[in-house]
Amino acid sequence: MAKQAPDVGDYKYGFHDEDVSIFRSERGLTENIVTEISKMKEEPQWMLDFRLKALKLFYKMPMPQWGGDLSELDFDDITYYVKPSEHTERSWDEVPEEIKRTFDKLGIPEAEQKYLAGVSAQYESEVVYHNMEKELEEKGIIFKDTDSALRENEELFREYFASVVPAADNKFAALNSAVWSGGSFIYVPKNVKLDTPLQAYFRINSENMGQFERTLIIADEGASVNYVEGCTAPVYSTSSLHSAVVEIIVHKDAHVRYTTIQNWANNVYNLVTKRTFVHENGNMEWVDGNLGSKLTMKYPNCVLLGEGAKGSTLSIAFASKGQVQDAGAKMIHKAPNTSSTIVSKSISKNGGKVIYRGIVHFGRKAKGARSNIECDTLILDNESTSDTIPYNEVFNDNISLEHEAKVSKVSEEQLFYLMSRGISEEEATEMIVMGFIEPFTKELPMEYAVEMNRLIKFEMEGSIG
């Protein structure tokens, strides 16, 4: 019996377009497929060697025995590379019409005109559009799709590529290393501070598609950058796979904020590795919004290498029927007087499952380090579940660690108070949820906060009755 596409009602991003690709690899993962990807991109020999070595690692490494159910993920039924257009365009008018219509629906041109210093749009396996304000280029900022950076900035690229997340890190990092395509490459020179966000948007359009972007950000000494990414996919009856790798290097006194708003359809496996190295007095902020997907497994990681380095993760996860959000954070304290903060907000409804999974590690040299963890979960019905799985490793007796976890339901007292003011039960529940996520949305740029609130309100529709 054929599978039915998931019922997502009026899911805004669930539309899909006709296949307009100019090349599509055969399904399945082989040395020939990996070699074909590298040859089509005209990569140097060292990158092909890296890919093939990663493929061997992928075959050898076991599947994770923890987290969500991956038993239905069939690596032989995935298309690993789809080339949607001949090359990356610098003018929106030159993007192929069918692809442009998709991004018009998603509001990318409007967002670029109003809010952004630079924007990159990836469709399937390749970046189809990329633009950056000229004045940023004059400051020495590099913002390119990752493939272009490999061709045009090979020495800088090679210095940092796979230095934070090696291919052997985990099975899905190995998979990404073998078949990576697209993503963003950012370099901000010493003491250059960029306040206006750079944005990338990742769209899966095809069925049984794998998207494997690789993002690499380097903030040199005293630099700062704010990067925002958004992700969506159509609704299909079969599964797609999104397995990205993000590597960030925060040099001395530098600051990076990395914001993700994902709203995948619930046929997408979202299995992502994100890690940053933070040097002396550097500051790394992860702001992570997880909606949709069949299964998300994502744990942004800060490795605090230099004295006074700071790391923080602020995340929200929303799981509804048939969805598992297995998310959290990792903070690795390797140096004295480092500090970290984790604030995790989770919501589950209609049988959805949310899991906070986190690690805080204090090494032997982490004298005076401190970490604060807050995990709050709101469960909206009796069918939904929540788990909190913290793991703390302490190898230094001169540290401070605080951990607070709270699970709650919408109380009858709260509802009664609001309903006595003439507010319906559904509106009252929505107000309580919006108040619950306010610590997250207030950290977003205004236009993203508005969109996040709209997405949460959409998820809340039909929660009562």
From Swiss-Prot:
Transmembrane residue ranges: none
InterPro entries: Fe-S_cluster_assembly_SufBD, SUF_FeS_clus_asmbl_SufB, SUF_FeS_clus_asmbl_SufBD_core, SUF_FeS_clus_asmbl_SufBD_sf, SufBD_N
A single GO BP: iron-sulfur cluster assembly
Protein family (similarity comment): Belongs to the iron-sulfur cluster assembly SufBD family.
Database matches in NCBIfam families: sufB
Identification of the protein by name: Iron-sulfur cluster assembly SufBD family protein SE_0610
